[in-house]
């Protein structure tokens, strides 16, 4: 318990707060490893909810900037759990009336920031794309994306395509139903949110799975190749994205045609796609 540990170490509130301030100072001049250490120890000792949340953000930023992706993922998960717990805690008495409108907006704002910051982790950690699907397809975060950050649908769509193999699951690599049905769920969202956001990546999925227009899907894939290749988070996944997208075209074509043009299927992964 932080209180018993504080008493045992004989630390007062001013000394504990100094850890936060010094961690903030370390971050300001670029010593991100030092900042992460000070903010971590501050969190262990502090009982100030708001400062602890701020320290979470600071440590996550520090872990991202030092490229410690396993540590950053752990911090991201901890921060998400903290935000979700605060969102689920209903205030009582007069506070419930006063903050009835402010709390949902603050929660939306915090989750929107988390969604954006998480892109650094999810597109650098080896298991990041599957973990992105787990988080972004959860109702609370999908609602956040739809309400405050529809452009994040690009990253959701790319992750669904990149995680094609993971969606098949298996005895050695079981996956959740959320990941297993990711493409189907993403297509629904893409179709629903088309009025406020679309790009060649989302259009590719729509043409392939909603319109069943394979020529249009291939055209959008050509455009998506440029979009993915120029995107800060996605550029290194360009070839993997194309390979998986071409497979999805062939798979969809074979599913809906009783007679299959073998030349089409064979050529699709190379020249035609």
Please give the residue ranges for each predicted region:
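Extended alpha-helical scaffold regions
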Residues: 1-273
């Amino acid at each position: 318990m932080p209180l018993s540990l504080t008493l045992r170490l004989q630390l007062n509130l001013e000394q504990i707060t100094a850890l936060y301030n010094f961690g903030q100072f370390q971050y300001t001049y670029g010593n991100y490893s030092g900042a992460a250490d000070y903010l971590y120890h501050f969190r262990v000792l502090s009982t100030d909810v708001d400062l602890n949340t701020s320290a979470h953000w600071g440590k996550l930023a520090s872990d991202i900037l030092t490229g410690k992706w396993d540590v950053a993922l752990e911090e991201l998960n901890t921060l998400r759990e903290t935000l979700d717990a605060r969102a689920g805690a209903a205030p009582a008495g007069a506070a419930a009336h006063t903050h009835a409108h402010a709390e949902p907006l603050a929660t939306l704002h915090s989750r929107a920031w988390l969604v954006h910051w998480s892109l650094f982790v999810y597109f650098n950690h080896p298991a990041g794309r599957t973990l992105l699907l787990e988080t972004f397809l959860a109702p609370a975060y999908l609602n956040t994306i739809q309400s405050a950050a529809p452009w994040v649908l690009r990253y959701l769509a790319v992750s669904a395509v990149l995680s094609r193999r993971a969606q098949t699951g298996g005895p050695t690599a079981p996956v959740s139903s959320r990941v297993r049905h990711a493409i189907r769920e993403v297509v629904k969202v893409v179709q629903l949110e088309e009025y406020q956001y679309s790009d060649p990546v989302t259009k590719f999925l729509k043409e392939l799975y909603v319109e069943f227009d394979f020529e249009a899907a291939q055209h959008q894939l050509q455009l998506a190749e440029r979009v993915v290749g120029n995107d800060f988070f996605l550029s290194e996944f360009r070839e993997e994205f194309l390979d998986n997208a071409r497979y999805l075209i062939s798979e969809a074509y074979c599913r809906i045609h009783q007679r299959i043009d073998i030349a089409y299927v064979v050529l699709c992964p190379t020249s035609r796609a």
